Design a protein with these regions (language model features):
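Short, surface-exposed ligand- or partner-binding patches at beta-edge/loop junctions that are enriched
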Residues: 99-100
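Rhodanese-like catalytic fold shared by cysteine-dependent sulfurtransferases
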Residues: 1-40, 47-96, 107-155
Length: 155
């Protein structure tokens, strides 16, 4: 799929009233990261998730994911400095940025916040790093970054 069509599909997935650029799958996020040299991935999960579940590995693209928690572990209070932390990581307002969490919920909130602050190219990775639970209540097998076979590493 070309990037123009991919972006159009991502925008079509938005819920009424959403103001960010779109909803992309993990595979689509990878395509954007691969095709656009300035595109960035912000992993909004917690330190515990990065340490125990793993991280996307963007090394073959010459990139690293920015690790900026949307919620701070263990209290899970919202990171009041999130938008500023994203800007401090080098993500400019016009930079295509993919926000990733476990399953697409926290990353959606992150995309909304950054879009409201001026980044018109904020995307939510809808299936997350691990995706939904399967019939055995395990994550990482039905959808998401890991299930798609995209590169990842244990932290």
């Amino acid at each position: 799929m070309n990037l123009k069509a991919l972006r159009a599909t991502a925008a079509e997935r938005l819920q009424p009233g959403d103001v960010y650029a779109g909803e992309v799958t993990s595979e689509e996020a990878w395509q954007i990261l691969e095709a656009e040299s300035d595109a960035a991935l912000v992993d909004v999960r917690t330190n515990a998730e990065w340490a125990f579940v793993g991280l996307p590995d963007l090394s073959q693209l010459g990139k690293e994911p920015a690790r900026i928690s949307w919620q701070v572990f263990p209290s899970m209070a919202e990171n009041a400095n999130f938008v500023g932390d994203v800007a401090a990581s080098g993500v400019a307002d016009a930079t295509p940025v993919m926000f990733l969490c476990r399953s697409g919920a926290r990353s959606r909130l992150a995309a909304i916040a950054c879009a409201a602050a001026g980044n018109t190219q904020s995307f939510n990775v809808i299936d997350g790093f691990e995706g939904p639970r399967d019939g055995s209540s395990h994550r990482g097998t039905r959808a998401g970054w890991k299930a798609a076979g995209l590169p990842w590493q244990q932290a």
